[in-house]
């Protein structure tokens, strides 16, 4: 198949504002559709060639720079302290996205608070590294979306937590639905994914991927090496994590829906959002003795393991928490409502705002509380 397509490097324009964004997005979209088609046909040489064309195109570079300079992290610099704010800086960013001589800089490590009081480490790349990752994300996402598990909902276009909850409701609300639930918890998923597995299975430029994985990070002026995992904070990291976890649903379906098994007795359902997942089965024994070992073996190949303390098997009548919701059957009828932990965190946030502003006029305090209350109510508006 002929992969030739007319792609310019850096056209002679007057600057950032002269870019025809409609044409750029159309060219990128056309190449992404061709990458997805080649992936479905398993023509991997064709995929690599089309990825090469996309990542060298002016359109791809411009769209990538626009993405990283217009998202919520656009004012957060990496270790070089630079951000691309002016049109001239953005144009220079487009011109800088070349593989030749490219060497990513270490990430700037920061810690953000979690709802449980602990902190989550984030690695902040430089603007150039962010743009290069965004460029390759354009080339890798068509592959990941084509090969993704059907019931994977995290970090994917046009999918959300509400879709994951709806999927659970559709599969578990019937009388004949499986009644036992395996709540899966992967121990340090982003921090422990095997670099060897990623380099062997992710269809992109391996030398570039290795540079990103081994870039390391700076914390309190000290350089730290990275020997495993994908840094939380990198634009491409969620897609790499998703691709590492994809394939489990297919393996479960092939194992428990093959001939010789009665569908009702061995029915298994699986729903995943990022590194959180649940798996339903007809009995505790099935989940404990067959499903859990299969999942553990799948994770082990990728350098991951299930948390013994947090991975649990529960009955649907007792309910389980997933993505801030509590899913439970009451006398055979499924109800989904905010989980106790989610409600507690919400009330703590409201109390903290009130305590932090004891002298604030009521109308100003209401102005600070409203976004928090509205956000929580909006997230839970589809339940029960």
Summary of predicted features, one role per range:
Residues 14-73, 138-154:
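Charged boundary/loop elements
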Residues 302-368, 372-374:
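A conserved non-catalytic segment of reverse transcriptases
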Residues 1-18, 38, 113:
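Extended, highly charged clamp/arch subdomains and adjacent linkers
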Residues 96, 100, 147-151, 156-159, ...:
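Conserved polymerase palm-domain catalytic core
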Residues 103-115, 210-225, 367-370:
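Active-site-adjacent bridging/hinge elements
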Residues 56-63, 363-379:
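Core structural elements
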Residues 121, 225-230, 351-365, 375-384:
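Short, solvent-exposed helix-loop connector elements
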Residues 47-119:
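Phosphate/adenylate-binding "loop-and-lid" substructures adjacent to NTP/NAD/dNTP-binding pockets
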């Amino acid at each position: 198949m002929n992969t030739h397509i007319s792609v310019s490097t850096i056209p002679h324009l007057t600057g950032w504002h002269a870019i025809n964004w409609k044409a750029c997005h159309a060219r990128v979209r056309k190449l992404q559709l061709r990458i997805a088609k080649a992936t479905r046909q398993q023509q991997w040489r064709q995929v690599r060639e089309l990825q090469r064309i996309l990542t060298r195109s002016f359109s791809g570079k411009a769209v990538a720079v626009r993405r990283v300079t217009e998202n919520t992290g656009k004012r957060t610099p990496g270790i070089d302290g630079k951000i691309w704010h002016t049109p001239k800086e953005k144009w220079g960013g487009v011109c800088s996205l070349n593989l030749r001589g490219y060497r990513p800089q270490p990430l700037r490590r920061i810690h953000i608070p979690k709802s449980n009081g602990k902190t989550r480490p984030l690695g902040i790349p430089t603007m150039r590294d962010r743009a290069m990752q965004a460029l390759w994300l354009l080339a890798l996402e068509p592959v990941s979306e084509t090969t993704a598990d059907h019931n994977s909902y995290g970090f994917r276009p046009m999918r959300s937590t509400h879709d994951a909850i709806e999927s659970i409701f559709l599969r578990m609300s019937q009388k004949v639905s499986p009644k036992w639930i395996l709540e899966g918890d992967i121990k340090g998923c982003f921090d422990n994914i095997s670099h060897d597995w990623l380099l062997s299975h992710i269809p992109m430029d391996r030398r570039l991927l290795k540079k990103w994985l081994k870039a390391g990070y700076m914390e309190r002026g000290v350089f730290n090496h990275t020997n495993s995992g994908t840094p939380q904070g990198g634009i491409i990291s969620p897609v790499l994590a998703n691709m590492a976890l994809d394939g489990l649903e297919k393996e479960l379906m092939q194992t428990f829906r093959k001939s010789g098994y009665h569908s009702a007795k061995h029915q298994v359902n699986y729903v995943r959002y990022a590194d959180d997942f649940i798996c339903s089965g007809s009995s505790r024994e099935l989940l404990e003795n067959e499903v859990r070992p299969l999942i553990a073996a799948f994770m082990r190949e990728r350098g991951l393991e299930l948390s013994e303390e947090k991975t649990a098997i529960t009955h649907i009548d007792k309910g389980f928490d997933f993505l801030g919701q509590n899913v439970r059957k009451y006398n055979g009828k499924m109800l989904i409502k905010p989980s106790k932990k989610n409600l507690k965190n919400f009330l703590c946030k409201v109390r903290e705002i009130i305590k932090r502003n004891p002298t604030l006029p009521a109308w100003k305090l209401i102005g600070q509380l409203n976004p928090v209350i509205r956000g929580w109510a909006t997230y839970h508006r589809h339940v029960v």
